[in-house]
Amino acid sequence: IQRTEDRVTRPRLRQPDGSYKEISYDEAIDWTARMLVKSRKTLMFGWINTSCQAMSAGHAIAEKVGGIVDNGATVCHGPSLIAIEDVGITTCTLGEVKNRADCIIFWGCNPAHVHPRHMSRYSIFPRGFFTKEGAKGRKIFCIDCRYTDTARCSDIFIRIEQGCDYEFLDAIRTVLHGGSLTQKSIAGVPADQIGKLAEDLKRAKFGVIFLGMGLSQTVGRNHNIDMAINLTYDLNRFTKFVVMPMRVQGNVTGSGEVLGWQYGFPFAVDLSRGDQARHQTGETTAIDLLLRGEVEASLFVAADPAATFPIEATISASKHPIVTIDPHINCTTEISDLHIPVAVDGVETGGCAYRMDTIPLEMRKVVDPPEGVLTDVELLKKIEKRVDELLAQK
């Protein structure tokens, strides 16, 4: 595992001619610490493919240098987290879905590609305690603006117009409240089909709505999620219904959990006042900071923002020092001034990670990392120690 000849096992520092030179870990730690101490506003983004212990170690550094900590939720389910803060959530674990759910709705998501084990382990095919017939005992709905492979696995596919999720959700809620639809079609769906959908949902014994980025990253954003959560509240007047965001990208759920219990906010946390955390969507989110040109240095940990951020944000980040901590070579490491490789979490080192239903799982080490390669926790603690030494000299 991960023993290819081209794997990077030593830190690489970019030279004036654009090439990379291998340096020692001590030199890399000193370079990173000096960058963090010198910068007046440091963006510490990522925390996706790493353990909760590493996140906590990174947050300790951010408090001391006044950095801003953000994670992958800012480009995926950040709006879902905002909606949950606004209206709460009725949810469950994936184990309950497997054992109880007889009605599954995939809304704006495509787990056949993004979560390839989701349907076979939890949502469609498994036989649970109260769902002994497996897929035959479940009714599967797919609601999306395009026909996907998940739609092929569904019993009923409802195609809605792009950007009209809010209106469609509102129409279902109207029917559930006993109202009548005055338009012949809403979001491209006939009114009688919306009424039939509402009746199907009411007849379920236990239903679950899985919300994807097609709902959180389209027109309406957090208001779409607000409406979906309120739909489950309405359905609970008739039967048992829950909702769950389809979180992606490794341990991004864990990052939100750790930030939440440490500072009270799940992403985009401004620690420029030390442990007095602040959060404001659009102000302290990574992309907005970069687009406004406020960031003086970037520390990217266990993520590849250069592959997912808008090109303008990536260009803005590249104008200032960048350190990337990641076991792999990716788009971000190639624009970084310093790339520090670490052990692969969940393979070469253990730690805690959160499943998409916020269940913590202990990752177990499988093999040893290459000789001399530090874990991310060890590296971050050494950076913190060096930061303390530099701050003491000021």
Map each language-model feature to its residues.
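N-terminal export/assembly segments and adjacent metallocofactor-ligating motifs
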Residues: 1-175, 188, 213, 294, ...
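Receiver (REC) domain switch-region micro-motif
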Residues: 44, 104, 209, 298, ...
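Short glycine-/acidic-enriched loop or helix-start segments at secondary-structure transitions
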Residues: 54-56, 115-117, 152, 219-221, ...
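Extended redox/cofactor-interaction regions of prokaryotic respiratory oxidoreductases
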Residues: 62-125, 131, 229-334, 343-348
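Short, surface-exposed amphipathic charged segments that create phosphate/polyanion-binding patches used
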Residues: 83-89, 172-177, 256-263, 338, ...
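Short alpha-helices
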Residues: 144-146, 150-182, 213, 221-228, ...
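Active-site phosphate/pyrophosphate-binding segments
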Residues: 167-168, 176-279
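Long, C-terminal catalytic modules of enzymes
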Residues: 338, 357-394
